[in-house]
Amino acid sequence: MAEFPAELYYSKNHEWMRKESDETFTVGITDHAQEQLGDLVFVELPETNIHVDAGDEVAVVESVKTAADVYSPLSGKVIEINNALENEPATVNRDPYGDGWLYRITIDDEKELNDLLDADGYQTLIEAES
C-alpha cells in the first residue's frame, strides 16, 4: 500500500514537495506513482539554474513497461538535481520520499502552494482514480 507522509505537499500529477526552507523545496514522484510505473530503469532530470513554470515538463522517468513525464508543481529556479539517480534510478522505487528525490527548486510565489494537495486530499484523488 502506498504511503503519503503528512508533512508533504502533493500535486494532481503525482509529484510531492517537501519544504526545506522558506523558498526551497525538494520534489519527487509519489510512492503511488512509482508503484504504478514499476521498476525504474532511467531518469532524465532537468538542468540546474533554469527557470520552470508550474505545469512545465521537467523530467522523465522510465520503467520496464512505460515512460512518464514529471511536471513541476511549482514555478521557480531549479537549483540542484539528484545526480545519484543517473546510476541508480531504482532508488526512486526503494525510497521515493528520501534518497529518491528528483530535484530542488527555489520557488517564485508561495501562493502556488494553495493549488496543491495535503496527504488526505491526495489519498482522496488516488481513490477516485481507482
UniProtKB/Swiss-Prot annotation:
Q: Does the keyword Membrane apply?
A: no
The protein, known as: Glycine cleavage system H protein
Choose one Gene Ontology CC annotation of this protein and give it.
glycine cleavage complex
GO BP: glycine decarboxylation via glycine cleavage system
Cofactor(s) recorded in Swiss-Prot or TrEMBL: (R)-lipoate
What is written in the cofactor note of this entry? Binds 1 lipoyl cofactor covalently.
Positions carrying N6-lipoyllysine: 65
In terms of NCBIfam families, this protein maps to: gcvH (TIGR00527), PRK01202.1 (NF002270)
Q: What does this protein do?
A: The glycine cleavage system catalyzes the degradation of glycine. The H protein shuttles the methylamine group of glycine from the P protein to the T protein.
Q: Which CDD domains match?
A: GCS_H
| UniProt xrefs under HAMAP family | GcvH (MF_00272)
One Pfam family name from the record? GCV_H
Assembly and oligomerization: The glycine cleavage system is composed of four proteins: P, T, L and H.
* Similarity comment: family membership: Belongs to the GcvH family.
The chain positions of domain Lipoyl-binding read 24-106
Q: Which UniProt keywords apply?
A: Lipoyl
Q: Which organism is it from?
A: Coxiella burnetii (strain RSA 493 / Nine Mile phase I)
Gene for this chain: gcvH
